[in-house]
């Protein structure tokens, strides 16, 4: 079991969904593959290995992470 985590096999397959509110529209966010409004929530799927980088990016853009859940394959509208 430890070897699975050590070589990253299991960790690499884990994905989490961030629910983010309050992102500002900037040149950097214009290049994203998803559209958002400042008042709405954005759902971003993030691989386990990039969680810290993505948190820093969201905070830098003025967003607030309101929830983090394991990705189940369901769309955001299915979960609500």
UniProtKB/Swiss-Prot annotation:
The keyword Cytoplasm does not apply. Its main location: membrane. GO terms for biological process: photosynthesis. GO terms for cellular component: phycobilisome; plasma membrane-derived thylakoid membrane. It comes from the Bacteria. Pfam families: CpcD. It is a peripheral membrane protein. It is found in: Cellular thylakoid membrane. Coiled coil: none annotated. This is Phycobilisome 8.9 kDa linker polypeptide, phycocyanin-associated, rod. It comes from Picosynechococcus sp. (strain ATCC 27264 / PCC 7002 / PR-6). The lineage of its organism: Bacteria, Bacillati, Cyanobacteriota, Cyanophyceae, Oscillatoriophycideae.
């Amino acid at each position: 079991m430890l070897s699975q985590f050590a070589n990253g096999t299991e960790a690499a397959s884990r994905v989490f969904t961030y629910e983010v509110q309050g992102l500002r529209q900037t040149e950097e966010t214009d290049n994203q593959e998803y559209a958002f409004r400042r008042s709405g929530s954005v759902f971003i799927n993030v691989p386990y290995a990039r969680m810290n980088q993505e948190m820093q990016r969201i905070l830098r853009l003025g967003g607030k992470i309101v929830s983090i859940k394991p990705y189940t394959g369901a769309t955001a509208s299915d979960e609500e």
